[in-house]
């Protein structure tokens, strides 16, 4: 299972990404005089809160490696759950 602090960090990033997006949209609509203040606000945002730092995690195990976006699971769990037939469209292959 993933550490609670890492899960909280991902939640914080997602929460603040909406704010950052709104600031950028407003920046494009305003005049140049006001955009400088908005640029300062964007630069003052801590790097930990940026969306590029977001790490995809498996919902069940919390594992970050071998993560499949389509299922939001890692490869080990896809194999286990897929063999039982709980994921639609996945079958055990044999040739």
From Swiss-Prot:
It comes from the Bacteria. InterPro entries: Ribosomal_uS14. Pfam families: Ribosomal_S14. The keyword rRNA-binding applies. One of its GO terms (biological process) is translation. The keyword Repressor does not apply. GO terms for molecular function: rRNA binding; structural constituent of ribosome. GO terms for cellular component: cytoplasm; small ribosomal subunit. Keywords: Ribonucleoprotein, Ribosomal protein, RNA-binding, rRNA-binding. Coiled coil: none annotated. Part of the 30S ribosomal subunit. Contacts proteins S3 and S10. Binds 16S rRNA, required for the assembly of 30S particles and may also be responsible for determining the conformation of the 16S rRNA at the A site. Belongs to the universal ribosomal protein uS14 family. This is Small ribosomal subunit protein uS14. It comes from Carsonella ruddii.
């Amino acid at each position: 299972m993933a550490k609670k602090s890492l899960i909280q960090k991902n939640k914080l990033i997602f929460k603040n990404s909406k704010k950052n997006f709104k600031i950028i949209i407003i920046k494009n609509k305003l005049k140049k005089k006001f955009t400088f203040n908005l640029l300062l606000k964007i630069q003052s945002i801590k790097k930990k809160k940026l969306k590029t730092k977001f790490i995809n995690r498996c919902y069940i195990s919390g594992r970050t490696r071998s993560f499949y976006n389509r299922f939001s699971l890692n490869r080990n769990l896809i194999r286990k759950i897929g063999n039982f037939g709980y994921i639609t469209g996945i079958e055990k292959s044999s040739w």
